[in-house]
Each structure stands twice: as C-alpha cells, then as structure tokens.
C-alpha cells in the first residue's frame, strides 16, 4: 500500500453507498499496522474523505489506566462537536511526517459524533490519550497537521527535517507517495 503525503484541504463527507468502503477500511488498517501506527486518516492514503481508523492496542502498556487495549474504532464522517477540559501536552508524531515529533497542547476532552462501521450514529465523549488520537486524526480530515499547532520558533527548528521529508530524503519502514513525485 502506498502511503500518501496528506492533502491540505478539508475532506468530503461520504454516504453508505461510497464505493468499496469496507475494502478501503481494511486497507487502511493494514497500512496502519504495517507502518506500526495507531491511527490513520483517509487523506493519508490518498482518499479525500472523512474516514479514520484507530487501533491503539500497542499503547496499552504505556497507558494502563486508559483501556487502550480495546481502543479500536472506525469513524466515518467524524465531527468534533466540543473540545474542553484542562490543556493536555503530549509528544505527537505522524506517519505522514516520519522521524519528527514535538510537544503539542490540546484540550483533554472531546465530544465527537460519527458513524461507526455499521452506519450507526454515535456521539461519545473521550478524554486523555484517546481524545488526543481522535483530535490528531480529525485534523487530517480538516487539512491540518500537528506541526500547524507549533509555535513559529519550534516550526523553524524542524524546517530542515520537513524539507527532507518533502524531498523523500528520509528513511522509514513504510512506502510513501510524495506530493508532486
């Protein structure tokens, strides 16, 4: 599977008749697992649709109190309705930007509405690391990356790494497709 440099535009809503949706979901999980990720948004694999897959089981030892073992979701057309709670700072990285990470501050709780894989409408509250993962992936759907949340100084500090990524001059375990390449 090719892993795309994400588009920087808002993704489109989809409906139940979207072509090959179940196969796209399976392919996204496979791509995410092969890259040793915990979440993947459709724009990262070249699909400009509002679709996210998450499986954070690999984080269960690092966050024993958050039940990461069972945190596996498919979010179709997710919308973060509300962000609230104390600010929560956490080191974020991304499959789209290999070898780059930094501390990002976000609200600690969210309310998100989405359709699950069976097209049941869900409205749920998430907190802590679970909220963080959903916020990060939903940013992709809105054409944003975690680096957009950095201060100008911090962004300047990683600029050379970002340029290497955009020129395909970085080593990573998974195949990527670069914009303009």
Q: Where are each of the predicted segments found?
A:
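Active-site rim/adjacent substrate-binding subdomains
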Residues: 8-135, 140-181
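Single conserved hydrophobic/aromatic residue that forms the stacking wall/gate
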Residues: 1-7
